[in-house]
Each structure stands twice: as C-alpha cells, then as structure tokens.
Amino acid sequence: MNTQLFSPFTIQNVTLKNRIVMSPMCMYSSENEDGKVTNFHLIHYGTRAMGQVGLVMLEATAVAAEGRISNKDLGIWNDEHIEGLQKTVSFIKEHDSKAAIQLAHAGRKAELHTDPVAPSAIPFNDKMKVPVAMSKEQIQDTITAFQKAAIRSKQAGFDVIELHGAHGYLINEFLSPLSNKRTDEYGGTAENRYRFLREIIHAVKEVWEGPLFVRISADDYHPEGLTVNDYVQFAKWMKEQGVDLIDCSSGAVVPAHIDVYPGYQVKYAKHLKEHAQIATGAVGLITSGVQAEQILVNSEADLIFVGRELLRNPYFPRTAANELGFELKDPHQYSRAPGKIANTSK
C-alpha cells in the first residue's frame, strides 16, 4: 500500500526516506557537564535510526557554554565536541537515516551558576533569575557563536540544521513582545524583534549550504503576545532568507495554561503552510500512523515530528507502517524475524 508517511521527501540535495522526524528532546545526559556526547546519546539516537526514522534530530545543542539550559546539555561551542557528534552522525547514517542537529541558546531560561542573558531584564517567572539585558556586543558574539556552531555541524557531517526559535529560549525571547522590551534596533516593531533571528540566519547561511529549519512557538497563549498570524510575516521573511521548513510548536515564552489534545499544534503548521507558502513540520501528541498519514493527506504539514511516542517506542515507524498496511524493510540483521509487530492496542 502506498502512503504519504512513508514516501520520500527531498529538501535541496537531501532526500529523507520517509516523513518521520525525531523531534529534538533534551536528554540532560552530558554527565561530565562538558557538553560532550556520551554512550547514552549514541545508543539513544542510533536506536531511532535502526527503528527507521527518516530524520533523526539531536536535542537542543548549546552554541555557548552559558547558553545551556542545564549543565548536562549537549554542546557545540568548541571543536572538542565534534568527535562525539561525528560518531553519532555516522551511526545514524549507517542505518539509512539522515541526521539533524538543533542549535540553541537558552537565554533567560538558562539554569546555571552564571547570570542568564536575554533581550531585556525580565525573568521568566518569580522563581528564576533576573537576566542581564544583552549589550550589542553580546548580541553579535551570540550570532557569531551560532555561525561557528554551524561550521562544526558541517564538520560533524549533519544533513540538516534547525535553529531553536521556540519555547521561550533566546531567539523566541527576541521575537516576542512579552520578553523583548528593548528600545534599540532589536526591539519594538516586528521587524526589529525579528532582526536577531534574521542576523543569525544570515550568518549561518554564509557557512552552511544544506537544509535549514527553524522551530517556532506559533502562539504565546497570552493576550498581548504573538499568535500564528504574527508568525505568517516572520515565516515569509524566513523563506526570503532561504529557510526551508518551519517546525511548528507553541508556548513557553511566558507561563501559561495550554489545553493539549491529539494533534493540538497541527493547525499552526497548516496555517503557515497555506499563508506563508513554506514547508512545515507538525508536532505535538502525534501518536499513531493513521493520525500522521491524515495530516499529510490533508496537506496540513510536510513532515511529522514525533517526540514522546519515540521515547515510548523507538520502533514507532514500524508500528505506524503496520497500522497503514505498509511493508517496511527490516534491518538485515533482524531479517530472521519478519512480519508484523503484534497490535497491542486492541
């Protein structure tokens, strides 16, 4: 049976064997607090590649030591990180998957011993540190850090880079008027609030020729915050700059109550795909092959980002294929045990 979920998808010169993407999820497992890959990461990401995920995306990887969410985040702020990342990429590709990395800076959400930085001196909540408002020199240093991280990503062999512009981290903090109260060229109007991301994209594109994604929070869930309609303009600017796909998440720039339900963020991917004419990824409580297939058939998104379901089941692609009646090729090492996985949902 032909399916959309298991059809190839080509972005520039990179072809994914299917539309399933492992959503970037922080593992907080760099145990020596040096940002380096551990055996856990190799097994964690390698298993999903063996499970036949089309694009395995590594977690938020810090472009600066002070830009980590925690001391145990993965890092890419110096050349010593390349070797471990390279090994992980190599293992992913051995299993015919493509490898992506999410480049990130935590901004005011960094929970380290150092003082966090942000566009403005506004804490996320009353339990977190008041961040230091970034100087223009710090802004330029951070843009350079993203560029250097892109160079290292290329050296490590990644196929795709994603910029983390969501969930209340630094890029998102500049975009949202709730966290950006600057009065210079990096604050105020939508165009000014976009400037930080614009300059990061420009810097990355100078050294990176491959596919470039941006993850966004398409809704601030606040009456004075951003909505998906605001992101239509941002997405158009990103497309003009050569961004290939918008990964559509939501929330977490300020504390807010969010009603979640299966596929609750798909509407954002659909809206931006239609109104900004850019490829999108859907994410958020997508837990079955039938659900994922329907999103693609309805042209609501181009790729399906799967998070927690891949934590529960590293072989989710096989489960999804069984649901859809699609014959997924076994890894040759496992060919002595052909056939469908039992359907335990009944």
From Swiss-Prot:
Reaction catalysis annotation: A + NADPH + H(+) = AH2 + NADP(+)
Any GO molecular function: NADP binding
InterPro entries assigned: Aldolase_TIM, NADPH_DH_bac, OxRdtase_FMN_N, YqjM-like
Keyword Oxidoreductase applies: yes
Pfam family, one: Oxidored_FMN
Entry EC number(s): 1.6.99.1
Cofactors: FMN
GO biological process entries: response to toxic substance
CDD domains: OYE_YqiM_FMN
Keyword terms of this UniProt record: Detoxification, Flavoprotein, FMN, NADP, Oxidoreductase
Chain residues that bind FMN: S23, P24, M25, C26, A60, Q102, R215, G307, R308
Chain residues that bind substrate: Y28, H164, G165, A166, H167
Top-level lineage group: Bacteria
SUPFAM superfamilies: FMN-linked oxidoreductases
Keyword Mitochondrion: no
Alphabetical list of NCBIfam families matching this protein: PRK13523.1
Family label: Belongs to the NADH:flavin oxidoreductase/NADH oxidase family. NamA subfamily.
Assembly and interaction partners: Homotetramer.
HAMAP family assigned: NamA
Role, per record: Catalyzes the reduction of the double bond of an array of alpha,beta-unsaturated aldehydes and ketones. It also reduces the nitro group of nitroester and nitroaromatic compounds. It could have a role in detoxification processes.
Protein name: NADPH dehydrogenase
